[in-house]
Amino acid sequence: MITKKDTLPASEAYTLLDDTGFIEELTAASVLSGKSEVQARKYARKCLIEMAATPSESWLAPAARFARFIYTRSYEKKLDINTEVLQELHELSRDNLLLFLWSHKSHMDSFAFLVSLYENDFKPLPLVFAGINMNFFGFGTLARKVGSIFLRREFHDDPIYKLVFRHYIDFLIRNRLPLTWSIEGTRSRTGKLSPPKLGILTWVLEACERQDMQNVKFVPVSIAFDRIAEIDDYVALQQGLPKRKESLRWFMNYVFGMKDPYGKIYVRYGEPVSIGDVDGALVNGDARGLASTEGAGDGPSLATRVAFEVCTHIEKVTPIKAADVLTMVLLGADGRALSEEEVYRQARKIAQLVRERGLPLAQGFSLEGLQQVSAVLLSMRGSKLVREFAKGRVPVYYIPDDRQIAAAYYRNTITHYFLAAAMGEVALAIGASDISVTREEELRDRVECLRDIFKFEFFFRPKDEFFAEVLQETSRRYSDWSGGKTSLKKQLRQSPPRFGHAILRSIAEAYYVVAVVLSELGEEPVTDAKRFAADLLQPGREMLLRRQISGESSISSDLYATGLQLAQHRGLLIPDGQNLAAGRRVFLDEVYEIVTAINLLQSNYNRAWFTS
């Protein structure tokens, strides 16, 4: 067992270049790369200099001031942190190597995360894995001095770089140096937690095994914002516009462009995950389709299981904010405006449900009073997310078409809390026309079909556990759904839905666009899924104009990409001994059934709120 007194600081990483074992492996790698041994030694040193962090204690205080200067240009200085959990982690770090994996919503994430540790005297600060694209002039030097490790995006075909990185990771793990990185790899453009990137996690797990590092804890960290500084960029990317390249000029424009007040930043630490916690995990669950990448019969890899547990733990501590709830309510109104009273009546019920379930809340969360809802609406108007029309009988509020994708981002940050209820509503709506009474087995079959359709969108818990929540939430709203005393159609009218149409409509409609266009191709293969997803934006626009889909939030290259991922998983892009046209038609029928069910939910909602 390696103890802390045996360890070296991160600045001593260059000693690995003189290690006998490394030199022997470098000789073999030089042959594969076509370099002489001298060239290989020189290139290996260059690779290590490029990637290695050079942290210095004297740089931490000025770096923390710099980080605060950046995020406080728009956000409140005081971070909302669950400090009691952070204190427990401080105690845990004495006997365990802590690896922090955080959600990635904004460029502000790493600044807020490191300040949350620094200001609470958490030492040593973890070294941060970052993309080489952030190693631009000026910023890269500072970041390296406070512990940034810069990695190339692709290095699979570079045997020397891979060798250096493997030995560098071994050095970090062997010397018990805490590490941190974004489990998503890149910023979420939709608001939902993105599928985890397994690259760094796999390297770290393999290093832990090689170094026999037993006491390792993966710490999930949720970083959330009242408002996202980059929200307009995310909307543009979903609409097919190119991503802006990072540079010093870009960084300066980004920082000094932050002028409006964006509210609070929330840093919430979750329950640590150990390797032992994930043994046998995912046997009955889905990891946003990650298991589909594993070899047949092998089951999910250790990295997949760890990533899934970390992501679900992040979701469990993500705070629910008042504006997130109101965007869900307003987006569920089918493009119509709601009065303040109507928003309040719907939001109050959701707030009561949230408190009953004991879900994590942002500090100051309150929607139980009309005055509180009014204040949130005022704030959302200030952010141009919501508009008011006050020249009629009563003032009404709505999300304009060009802000639907932005509003959907905030709604999506909390949809996982209401997913079981949403799927229960859709499953009931699918069977609403049946003459026979819906039984529990039928409901479960429909829910599992919905899980399979949306497997690349959400992190689903094991099937039995998830369906138990579906039953609980469905029975909470529709107590006689399986009793037969009242038809499902009547029950859905009497108790209008809350979540199915509000959460799943944009995804289902985006998949409908994918399915329609694929079906029209017949047997024609799709060889470039990325290009095809971008090309779907125009058919999506056409279908919106023809009212085959309902709103702008269904026209999203990100949603089209996950829809195509599902189609690819089902073998519907390239012929592989099956009839593509027939398979695509079945896919279209499945998605159309879901869209039809959601339309039924929407019509019942509209009847309840817009029929005088």
Indicate residue ranges for each PLM-predicted region.
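Membrane-interfacial terminal anchoring regions of lipid-handling membrane enzymes
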Residues: M1-S612
